[in-house]
Amino acid sequence: MDKKPTIAILKNEIDKLKSSFDTEKDEKDTKINHILSVVEGLSKSLSLYIEDNDKETTNEEVNIDEIDKNIVKNLEDKVNCLEQDVQYLKNELKKKDADWQQKLDLIVHQFTKQYDSLKSSLLISQKETSVFQSVQNNSNLPNNSNLPIETPILQIKFAALTEYAQKPKRGSEFSAGIDLRSAYEYLVPANGNKLIKTDWKIQYPDGYFGKICSRSGLSLNHNLEVGAGIVDADYREGVSVVLNNLSPRDFHVAPGDRIAQLVCTPYITPEIVFCKPSDIPDTVRGKNGFGSTGIN
């Protein structure tokens, strides 16, 4: 690859995205307008970065020869994915079939994930129109290049529904789960279960859901396991925990006791397609089900 990779190349690819939209858009179609706004924000950020780092260059090319070419290739691939998403979006909107709104939701979701990934890779500020902040003499960057550093921060929002909600917390800095606490006093009967309220309303980052898991200490020492542990991203009531007591003894839960852990987990929503059994190819395993692969 003789041609030096440049930020300008990426900007040109982003500009293609902008031109792929029809000039006239339905003002009520907020989702399409949102996609266009983030694309324009990305393009503007790239322009500002180019101007800030190479004001004397007339062709808007910024030499990033010091950057690993594999990194730039990865960025270009992501831009191409975005371009394909936009083209697919346009084609689907032209059809306006019965499922077009559902397809639009899926496309917007996938587009947003692709855009966030690209934005993170380009180290763009979380505000679409902000300017890159150059960082010099950083030993973590190749050849101390003036690449900006921006670490995207995911947030999970907790809103207390009552004064009895006990603050959740992580057990350690790198714990995957956030410990959930009981808001009230309960007695979980032997060989039975109880619905434990936390009195917290939760909002997850886009593309994530909450997975409620058992705590190892309760599982090992008291035979307490969590049941029905999926909290969907669009669920907006107070989060409760189904606590199953598999032991022959009742278990007392006091207000503030840690009864489960919440893991913020990414997910995808593939489109459901109905077909004939013959449309699904056979595999080596075939119909062999429970226990067919053995235990060793």
Swiss-Prot record:
It is an enzyme of class 3 (hydrolase). This is Probable deoxyuridine 5'-triphosphate nucleotidohydrolase. Signal peptide: none annotated. The keyword Coiled coil applies. Its EC number is 3.6.1.23. Pfam families: dUTPase (PF00692). It comes from Invertebrate iridescent virus 6 (IIV-6). It catalyses: dUTP + H2O = dUMP + diphosphate + H(+).
